[in-house]
């Protein structure tokens, strides 16, 4: 899709959030939450604001040359 729509100045990118500290994770007990945190080289869960900032940037003119890309935002989880 990114290639098809690029000629129309429409950029298509993907964001892959990792474990984000949301009410959904609040249901986990502390031990499980610590196990999940330990899987992240950065040593913490992500914040929803961090995901929003990346999406905001990708949607802005500052990212006008970014197209067809995937952006994991997971504190290094996939690299681990």
Regions found by a protein language model. Name each.
Residues 3-7, 20, 46, 59:
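A short hydrophobic alpha-helix cap/turn motif
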Residues 40-51, 62:
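A conserved structural motif in NAD(P)-dependent oxidoreductases
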Residues 56, 67-80:
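Short C-terminal tail/terminal secondary-structure segment
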Residues 16-27:
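Short, flexible catalytic-loop segment of classical short-chain dehydrogenase/reductase
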Residues 6, 11, 66-68:
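Short, small/polar-rich loop/turn modules that mediate ligand/substrate recognition or access, typified
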Residues 26-40:
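A short C-terminal helix-loop "cap" of Rossmann-like NAD(P)-dependent dehydrogenase/epimerase domains
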């Amino acid at each position: 899709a990114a290639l098809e729509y690029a000629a129309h100045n429409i950029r298509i990118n993907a964001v892959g959030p990792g474990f984000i500290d949301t009410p959904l994770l609040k249901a986990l007990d502390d031990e499980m939450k610590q196990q999940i945190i330990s899987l992240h080289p950065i040593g913490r869960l992500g914040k929803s604001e961090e995901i929003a900032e990346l999406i905001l940037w990708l949607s802005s003119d500052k990212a006008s040359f970014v197209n067809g890309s995937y952006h994991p935002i997971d504190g290094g989880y996939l690299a681990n």
